[in-house]
Amino acid sequence: MPARVIVGLSGGVDSAVAALLLLRAGHEVHGLHMSNWEEDEAGYCSAAADLQAAHSVARELGIPLHRVSFAAEYRERVFADFLAAYAAGRTPNPDVLCNREVKFGVCLKYARRLGGERLATGHYARVERAGGRMRLLRARDRAKDQCYFLQQVPAAALAAVEFPLGELAKGEVRELARRAGLPVHDRPDSTGICFIGERPFRAFLGGYLAPRPGPIETPAGERLGLHDGLAFHTIGQRQGLKVGGRAGYPEAPWYVAAKDLARNALIVVQGHEHPLLMASAFEVEDLCWLAAPAGTTLDCGVQVRHRSGDVPCRLEIDATRVSVTPHRPIRALAVGQYAAFFAGPECLGGGVVTGVRTAAQPAEAILATRTRPPRRPRLRQSLPDRDRSGPL
């Protein structure tokens, strides 16, 4: 009897082709469309269009489609932490948390309730199982590789997951969809954070976090202007500072270099590679190891953003924290970002950046930049929710 595989059908071309390939491999395939966010009146969230597209794919492939809402779980496990991190001066990545908590957390459990032996998605990554060991490997299409977003998914969950697109390039995926007559073959890829869509990020965040004005200063303490809240700015930011044209300074862009949480001050500098923007060392906590290091030091690569290249580095490892020394400085690294570690194509795991030392700071500065785990803020509006739905 063929194995039942539950495919997360998002409404996009990637998940549609994942389902197609599994059908061609002889599996019993069921589609599962999950909703994590409510459609808003302005139409920024594409939930309704995504569901309609998932319906059309399921009909074309002749597979059942189930629908479920994880809005409550997303609200509590992802979005509330996202807001708390920004309120605490961090720069989080909710997509990493969503993969750990929702897509390969509660959704994987739901797939098992549907009788699925595995959960498959349209992620560009590879899972290799050999010798009793599971390895998470980069996709063949390096430009589309999504291992960075999967770094926090536990090995036990990944062992029950299939990534059918791991050996394919994006162009090949679209061509497969076109030849199979899938109605989403030319549907544009989704971009940005899922619950924000194409709306201005500042306006979205301002709907939940109240302004908290403070000074914009140079590293020497000269006041240049006012910001409306540290939460609305991130390290390396250039736009929206409104501090240009200052007498005594060159006509050059200003960049956010640091946040002084104690004084609610935003520190800005001139120069794209100003020393205060270049991280020479940083600390990572909230670790998830997919391949546990054998010793207390490790030479590997580190990736701190999606689609950024690996930077060779040395790790000094203890039970709860990793100190990272990159072989070359990393620009605009913010507390709250995720760092993923790689040995060649294999993702070893990763964690959250909790402290940063730059080329212009003394060694003890890394302690000063370390932030406590964020507390959830008081919200200006309630968080979205949606009731669960069943099979369609």
What are these regions (language model features)?
Residues M1-Q152, E162, G171-E172, R178, ...:
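ATP-dependent adenylation/nucleotidyltransferase module used to activate substrates
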Residues V13, A120-V127, G132-D385, P391-L392:
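AMP-forming adenylation/ATP pyrophosphatase catalytic core
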